[in-house]
């Protein structure tokens, strides 16, 4: 994976370890360095990616989807202040509907032109891919030009598993309904 994209993902992930989490700059830099190299070495170039909290402990999970595979990266145990080694856990799973589940809770906001509201959808995607389970909360706005990375990743996963048609969840379909 290209270093520019890798650097952006690693920086987004290490933001979870910021000052509120009582990690020093040195610890965060070591985590960032390890993630950059793990992503560069083990994440394919043509991947759809997102970073989000996982496991309810404030730890980031970096996920990628490409070629019917899911790639997951995390730091299971952040290093201590004087520990030079950072362990990055890398997992790769084949997207097999027999070993995967997708659930979604959807809520829609009806537009109200008087208040400038637009149609939007909030979704809490829940995935189980072999032994990896995670939630992806997302939001889609009808007036938005793009899709947030977490929504793009969730759609890519659901489409790869064949549980939703390719056109059912995109922003264009929200605009057409409005």
Where do the protein language model's features map onto the residues?
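Phosphoinositide-binding peripheral membrane targeting modules
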Residues: 51-122, 133, 160
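Generic extreme N-terminus detector
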Residues: 4-6, 89, 178
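Canonical pleckstrin homology
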Residues: 101-177
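Anionic N-terminal interaction surfaces
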Residues: 1-63, 67
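A sequence-composition feature that detects small, non-aromatic residues
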Residues: 10-15, 34, 38, 50, ...
């Amino acid at each position: 994976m290209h270093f520019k994209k890798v650097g952006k993902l690693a920086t987004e992930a290490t933001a979870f370890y910021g000052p509120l989490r009582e990690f020093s700059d040195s610890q965060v830099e070591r985590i960032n360095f390890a993630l950059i190299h793990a992503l560069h070495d083990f994440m394919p170039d043509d991947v759809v990616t997102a970073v989000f909290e996982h496991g309810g402990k404030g730890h980031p999970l970096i996920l990628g989807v490409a070629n019917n595979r899911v790639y997951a990266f995390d730091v299971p145990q952040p290093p201590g202040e004087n520990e030079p080694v950072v362990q990055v856990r890398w997992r790769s799973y084949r997207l097999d509907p027999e070993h995967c589940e997708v659930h979604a809770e959807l809520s829609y906001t009806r537009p109200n032109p008087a208040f400038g509201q637009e149609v939007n959808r909030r979704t809490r995607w829940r995935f189980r891919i072999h032994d990896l389970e995670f939630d992806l909360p997302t939001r889609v706005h009808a007036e938005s030009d793009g899709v947030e990375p977490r929504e793009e990743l969730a759609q890519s996963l659901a489409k790869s598993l064949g549980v939703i048609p390719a056109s059912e969840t995109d922003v264009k379909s929200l605009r057409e309904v409005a």
